[in-house]
Structures are given as C-alpha cells and as structure tokens.
A protein has these predicted regions:
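Short, internal strand/loop/helix patches
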Residues: 121-167
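Thiol-/selenol-based redox modules, centered on thioredoxin-like
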Residues: 158-203
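Short, acidic, Ser/Thr-enriched surface-loop or helix-capping motifs
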Residues: 51-52, 174
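Thiol-based oxidoreductase modules, predominantly thioredoxin-like and allied folds used
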Residues: 100-115, 130-139
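Generic structural signal for well-ordered beta-strand positions
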Residues: 57-58, 180
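Short active-site neighborhood of thiol/selenol oxidoreductases, capturing the structured segment around
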Residues: 59-83, 87
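Conserved helix-turn-beta segment immediately C-terminal to the redox Cys motif
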Residues: 65, 84-107
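N-terminal targeting signals for export/organelle localization
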Residues: 1-46, 202-203
Length: 203
C-alpha cells in the first residue's frame, strides 16, 4: 500500500467510526423523557410483610433486580389493572427488543384487609410470570408507603364494598434496594420502553 492509499484508508476508517458513533447516539437516547430520576437513590425503608405465597419478606426482597413497584389493590376497578397491563406490555416489548436486565413487576396492596396472599397471587399472576405481590399488616404497609412518599386512604363504609384512594405512581427500585426513579403518569407502554433502558443502564 502506497502512502496515498494508506491516507485514504485511514480517512475512510475515521469516517466509518464517526458514522457508527452518530448512529448509536441516535438510536440510544441519553436521558429519560418521562421518568423523574432522583438525584440520589433513596433506600427502601425497613418493613415486615408477606409475599403472595404467604412467606415473610422484608426490604431485602428488593435486592438483586430492578423492580417496578405499584401500590394498589385487587378490588380496584380501573387504575390498578390498567397500570399493571401497561407494565406487563412494556416488559414484553423490552424482552422482544433484547433488553437485559428486565424489571420485575411488584404490586403492594393498600387494602390488606381484603387482599390475602392467595388473592394477591391470583391477581399478580394474571399479568404475567415472575411478578411479586406484597400484603400484610396495615401498619407495616403504612411504614413502607410513608417512607416512599406514597399516599393512600380508605373510603369510610359500613359494608365490604369500599374503595381506596391511592397514589398512581410507579416507582423504579434499583438492585441495591434504592428508590431510583418515578413514573407519575400517564402510564403509556412507549414511555416505559423508551425510558427504562436508560434508567436501568445508568445505575
């Protein structure tokens, strides 16, 4: 190869590398558009509750994987099932795109009076495999929600058919058990598909 050919080859290589970097930057957004990322992750507060199999769990259940945590209840008429369907669809889409890791979907009951472990298992299993349901003593749930800034309140009623007002946010918990980010809604599949790889990749 003569000097002129060598210079041309170097120039072509640099142009190709620059084009590849530009394409990658166009394909992989650097900042989330829909999630609010906390400046520093907040540790999940200590708690003692039950999973959907009735086994005792504590805050360490959030260690070792990414979690999408929603606070709701199985008798919720619309917001809860709709949000969980969105999370399930987003997780499926991310899996089809080859996203690793995939987040786990977690439902924490704000109606433990009715949400037994058995009922929680039926409910979370409806939205896919590997989901986690959490229920238990009301004071422990209140400890968890208060520490994460989640609101809920039971409507006063004399019967068993009552509603529970609650925050509709979805929390992103990192593998270290830290509250990393927040999706406040509206909950749209595309929003999660866009932002989750960025949030999970930035920890």
């Amino acid at each position: 190869m003569n000097p002129r050919q060598f210079i041309i080859a170097i120039a072509l290589g640099l142009a190709l590398a620059a084009g590849t970097c530009l394409a990658l930057r166009m394909q992989i957004p650097s900042e989330p558009k829909f999630a609010l990322v906390l400046p520093e992750p907040n540790p999940v507060p200590e708690f003692s509750l039950l999973n959907q199999r009735g086994m005792p769990i504590d805050q360490t259940v959030f260690a070792g994987q990414w979690d999408l945590v929603f606070f709701g209840f199985t008798h919720c008429p619309d917001i809860c099932p709709t949000t969980l369907q969105v999370l399930a669809a987003a997780k499926t889409t991310l899996q089809e795109k080859g996203q690793v890791p995939l987040p786990r979907i977690v439902l924490v009951s704000v109606d433990p009076e009715r949400d037994t472990p058995e009922l929680m298992q039926q409910y979370v299993d409806y939205f896919g495999e590997g989901n986690l349901g959490i229920t238990g003593a009301l004071d422990e749930i209140t400890r968890l929600t208060s520490g994460l800034g989640i609101f809920f309140a039971k409507h006063l009623s004399d019967g068993e058919d009552y509603a529970v007002d609650h925050s509709a946010a979805v929390l992103v918990i990192n593998p270290d058990g830290g509250f990393e980010a927040l999706f406040s809604g509206p909950h749209v599949v595309e929003n999660y598909v866009h932002d989750l790889p960025i949030v999970m990749g930035g920890n």
